[in-house]
Design a protein with these regions (language model features):
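Polar low-complexity intrinsically disordered regions
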Residues: 165-180
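Short, contiguous clusters of charged residues that form electrostatic/catalytic patches at enzyme active sites
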Residues: 28-31, 150
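Non-catalytic positions within long, well-ordered alpha-helices that form the structural scaffold/packing
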Residues: 15-16, 66
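Catalytic alpha/beta core domains of metabolic enzymes, predominantly
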Residues: 38-164
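Glycine-rich, proline-tolerant flexible connector loops at the mouths of alpha/beta enzymes
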Residues: 1, 19-21, 174
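Single conserved hydrophobic/aromatic residue that forms the stacking wall/gate
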Residues: 2-13
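Phosphate- and divalent-cation-binding pockets in alpha/beta enzyme and binding domains
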Residues: 31-33, 83
Length: 180
């Protein structure tokens, strides 16, 4: 049985407000949320994404996060393609993969790796646009938003060009799944 509902109050309030997913920064809270969802205290359709800030990057950690209730997992951002592929082989939930990073936390850009990320790791959510702001969690301006959209377009263009077999879900479609 999970600890008292006090930790969950913001989660239940958010769901009633229309929010259907949370980024979770703590493994213990992830377990509490999973248990609350299983007991019906949170709706079954409430999704939990594990944050890259948790710092996981190995298959054993990913399996644990999946078992703790993560519906998708963000690995640490600087893993090689073979390392990412090893994570995919371990879990069935979608991976959230960063294709770029703010200058304040590494500043890498992996646009040309995006097609291979999709090929090796699908189902994935490609996360892009972070390199357009100076640091993580900083407020974005309208200009940053335009740059982020441009960066997302470039990533999509690379995937379409170098891995045209990739299937992109349309807005409103079901979540990505491992193919049978």
């Amino acid at each position: 049985r999970p600890p008292p509902i006090y930790k969950l109050f913001p989660s239940t309030t958010l769901f009633r407000s229309g929010i259907r997913g949370l980024i979770v920064y703590d493994e213990g809270l992830l377990w509490v949320l999973k248990e609350a969802r299983a007991m019906g205290e949170l709706p079954a359709e409430m999704k939990f994404k594990n944050s890259a800030h948790n710092g996981q990057g190995n298959p054993a950690s990913f399996k644990l996060l999946e078992d703790l209730g993560a519906d998708s997992i963000n690995p640490v951002r600087d893993l090689s393609i073979p390392m990412l592929a090893a994570l995919r082989q371990t879990v069935n939930v979608p991976l959230d993969l960063h294709t770029d990073n703010p200058p304040g936390s590494g500043g890498f850009i992996r646009v040309y790796e995006a097609p291979e990320m999709v090929r090796c790791c699908a189902p994935v959510y490609l996360k892009t646009g972070n390199s357009c702001v100076s640091g993580h969690g900083q407020l974005t301006t309208a200009s940053n938003g335009i740059d982020m959209a441009r960066q997302a377009h470039i990533v999509l263009e690379m995937v379409n060009r170098y891995y045209p077999e990739a299937i992109q879900l349309k807005a409103g479609e079901a979540e990505p799944q491992i193919a049978d």
